[in-house]
């Protein structure tokens, strides 16, 4: 039994929810998002909340139940508040800057990396060693942050590279003489 799936997703004022068949659409101050619920799950909007139920008690339906409810909750939060991920850059000469509609990263390679910002995502660099990725779609914000981090992930000896804000990097000791 899904503990996550049991709870209905409350829709706050300022957000309009529309359920048409297996498609859930949310519209709020930040924008509009939609999610197609898997066919093993029933979704309905009543009393100002979206509830999700499994069609039957099969393992697959029960697995998708909690996942679908979490996806719908992410739609509500995305269109009302939005999501953001912060990245920190550590290392001598490592920096980030905005270059028009692209993010320019200097990460110790022989060339600078130009990262094209996808539609629906906003990237801000408050400091040369800080990147803030924001948007309404939680999955896309996380994906963009992961792609930027992948260019030079943090290494365990000196901790140089791109990491998420607050991420703990397991440090190793160098070799002994």
From Swiss-Prot:
Swiss-Prot/TrEMBL GO biological process terms: cytoplasmic translation
The entry's family comment says: Belongs to the universal ribosomal protein uL6 family.
Top-level taxon of the source organism: Bacteria
- Which terms in the GO cellular component ontology are assigned? cytosolic large ribosomal subunit
The protein here is known as Large ribosomal subunit protein uL6
Identify the coding gene: rplF
**Which keywords are on file for this protein?**
Ribonucleoprotein, Ribosomal protein, RNA-binding, rRNA-binding
This chain's function reads: This protein binds to the 23S rRNA, and is important in its secondary structure. It is located near the subunit interface in the base of the L7/L12 stalk, and near the tRNA binding site of the peptidyltransferase center.
GO MF terms listed in the record are: rRNA binding; structural constituent of ribosome
Which Gene3D superfamilies does this one have?
Ribosomal protein L6, alpha-beta domain
- Note the subunit structure: Part of the 50S ribosomal subunit.
Q: What NCBIfam families does the annotation carry?
A: L6_bact
A Pfam family (short name) is Ribosomal_L6
């Amino acid at each position: 039994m899904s503990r996550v799936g049991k709870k209905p997703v409350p829709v706050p004022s300022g957000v309009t929810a529309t359920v048409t068949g297996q498609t859930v659409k949310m519209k709020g101050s930040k924008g509009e998002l939609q999610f197609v619920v898997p066919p093993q799950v029933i979704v309905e909007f009543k009393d100002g909340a979206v509830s999700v139920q499994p069609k039957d008690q099969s393992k697959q339906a029960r697995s998708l139940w909690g996942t679908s409810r979490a996806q719908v909750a992410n739609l509500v939060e995305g269109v009302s508040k939005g999501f953001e991920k912060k990245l920190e850059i550590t290392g001598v000469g490592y920096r980030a800057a905005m270059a028009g509609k692209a993010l320019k990263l200097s990460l110790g390679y022989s060339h600078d990396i130009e990262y094209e910002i996808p539609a629906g995502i906003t990237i801000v660099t408050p400091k040369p060693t800080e990147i803030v990725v924001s948007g309404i779609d939680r999955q896309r914000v996380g994906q963009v942050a992961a792609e930027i981090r992948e260019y030079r992930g943090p290494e365990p000896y000196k901790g140089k590279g791109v990491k998420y804000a607050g991420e703990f990097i397991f440090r190793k000791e160098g070799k002994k003489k």
